[in-house]
Amino acid sequence: LKKLTRFYHPKTIEEACQFLGNGEGRTAVIAGGTSAALRADSSLEALVDISHISELNYINKDAAFYRIGACTRVQDIYKSPDLKGPAGKLLQAAAGKIGSTLLRNAITAGGNLAGLFPWSDLPVAYMALDAEVVCRRGRPKRTVPVMSLIETRAPQFLAANEIIAEIIVPAYGPGTGTAFAKLAKTANDYAIISLAVRLTLKEGVVNQARIAVNAITAQPVRCLEAEKLLEGKALSEELIAEAANKATDSINIRKDIRASEEYRRE
């Protein structure tokens, strides 16, 4: 960060967006700082630290949704007594698999999405839950599907003076089940593969299936062929095995120093 000359500490969303949009060279947002540290972008001239904006740090629930502020720490998600039911279970399972306690106290709900890496764990949970993201430019805001932000990636999706403010997750109820799994060499290591699943059943038949994976690809993707196979059918061990085999059919699996393409596919 040799060109870094300015560091801003806004107290409100409006201030943060103003700093981002003032046109004073290359500027980036940080909250936990872990993504910025890994990328070490040498062209950055200014950082806007939004971690002290209280209106971005919360976990709330209304009748049908959980609302999570973008600066909520992953550790707070993992330990929150307010996250319950199928959605809460999946979010906490994913949060609990992120690194160590030290890292979970730095990484944020929005940062894990904005600073997207192949090993990021929360985004697959957001995708499986059909979450939405609230993006703010001061007072103006827009609500978009998390899939849209992930597919385009935050730096290209967000305007120069725009930040992720909130993640909205449907609470789901009876008839919905969720699961999260992560394979890594150690408990604190990056994922070789991470997987989030949500199945919503109606009268014993899969009404909606969501299967999202990461680490085997450059960014999280849904296993659309496996989802289609499950929907409209009654669950059985044979169907689940067939869906598992089909999950990676249409996915270009990557290789790296942690695992080969063949190992990840298996």
What are the functions of these language-model segments?
Residues 1-266:
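C-terminal structural segment of proteins
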